[in-house]
Amino acid sequence: MVHCAGCKRPILDRFLLNVLDRAWHVKCVQCCECKCNLTEKCFSREGKLYCKNDFFRCFGTKCAGCAQGISPSDLVRRARSKVFHLNCFTCMMCNKQLSTGEELYIIDENKFVCKEDYLSNSSVAKENSLHSATTGSDPSLSPDSQDPSQDDAKDSESANVSDKEAGSNENDDQNLGAKRRGPRTTIKAKQLETLKAAFAATPKPTRHIREQLAQETGLNMRVIQVWFQNRRSKERRMKQLSALGARRHAFFRSPRRMRPLVDRLEPGELIPNGPFSFYGDYQSEYYGPGGNYDFFPQGPPSSQAQTPVDLPFVPSSGPSGTPLGGLEHPLPGHHPSSEAQRFTDILAHPPGDSPSPEPSLPGPLHSMSAEVFGPSPPFSSLSVNGGASYGNHLSHPPEMNEAAVW
């Protein structure tokens, strides 16, 4: 006994139909959608039978306007890669049906504005950032085939989409000023992860890749295109900044070494022409070589003599206001203009070579009063080398106070 593939009952009729290599009752061969009897031809999918219209409506090419299937007998319009019913291919402003070859402006890939309405209503064009296209136009006019420099130039006309747009609406309103932008699009975290992964693989994706991203993320293809443009621009700026930082780091990390002032200066060797000469090299008309500790009783020539007024570092009085000694007793053999040498003797000693009082020196010792230099030992003795050569000339009264200024 033969059973029907549709109702699973035995076939007792005189006639039967053989569909998909199975036996059917005549009344069981019908469309699963509209329930019409199929006599001449039928279409099947997943074991179900469909009539021609229902099959193309369910599984055929979808209209980009109404999202319904397109029958093979229907007339269609094509714009870029989209297919539309004639009734769906109309202007969204005036509902006029657009004809083949007519210039139009596309919004969100599935809405159209005719040229007349676009030109007459410029505010709509500014708000929605419309881009012109021609029905059935050559693929060279599509954004995919344009030069990369033009892609970056279109950023100023399109909606600015970035991964920080969620919290930057207030700042954007201030920065835009008088210029109006298109509607803002907020990209969620999951969508952003998908876009970043796609950018890491291909920084400039093709239209096919963008269509796949649009299906995965649910975003508009124009939004995805603008996001990739902004991302490429950001990457270029980051590369420029990193290159500038690398040059600056190399400049400060390895500066040129300065050449030494004196080439190949041996240890212990002195700089012969330095700004400060050594004690043994110092010569003048008063001090000869090695004569830094000599005292000249006759004093300098009267034309170059100095007075205490010319010596700014010698105090004119002590803490109590008492003048430092008397100047009315000239030394024997001194010229009257050499009172500065009689008042003080400037000696230059290197550190650690300060003279100490030694009773074996034949020259007299000069005491320094404690009233002049504050709390110090009651009397500090200063001895001068070469005292034997001038000891006979120092015969001034003992109450005179002389101090060696170091």
UniProtKB/Swiss-Prot annotation:
Compositional bias annotation for Basic and acidic residues: 151-167
UniProt GO cellular component terms: chromatin; nucleus; protein-containing complex; transcription regulator complex
DNA-binding region range list: 180-239
GO biological process: anatomical structure formation involved in morphogenesis; anatomical structure morphogenesis; animal organ morphogenesis; anterior/posterior axis specification; anterior/posterior pattern specification; branching involved in ureteric bud morphogenesis; cell-cell signaling; cellular response to fibroblast growth factor stimulus
GO molecular function per UniProt: cis-regulatory region sequence-specific DNA binding; DNA-binding transcription factor activity; DNA-binding transcription factor activity, RNA polymerase II-specific; RNA polymerase II transcription regulatory region sequence-specific DNA binding; sequence-specific double-stranded DNA binding; zinc ion binding
Phosphoserine sites (modified residues): S162
UniProt keyword list: Developmental protein, Differentiation, DNA-binding, Homeobox, LIM domain, Metal-binding, Neurogenesis, Nucleus, Phosphoprotein, Repeat, Transcription, Transcription regulation, Zinc
Feature: compositional bias, Pro residues: 352-362
InterPro entries on file: HD, Homeobox_CS, Homeodomain-like_sf, Lhx1/5_LIM1, Lhx1/5_LIM2, LIM_Homeobox_TF, Znf_LIM
The LIM zinc-binding domain, residue ranges: 4-54, 63-117
Domain notes for this protein: The LIM domains exert a negative regulatory function and disruption of the LIM domains produces an activated form. In addition, two activation domains and a negative regulatory domain exist C-terminally to the homeobox.
Entry function: Potential transcription factor. May play a role in early mesoderm formation and later in lateral mesoderm differentiation and neurogenesis.
Subunit text: Interacts with LDB1 via the tandem LIM domains.
Protein name: LIM/homeobox protein Lhx1
Source organism per UniProt: Homo sapiens
Gene name of this polypeptide: LHX1
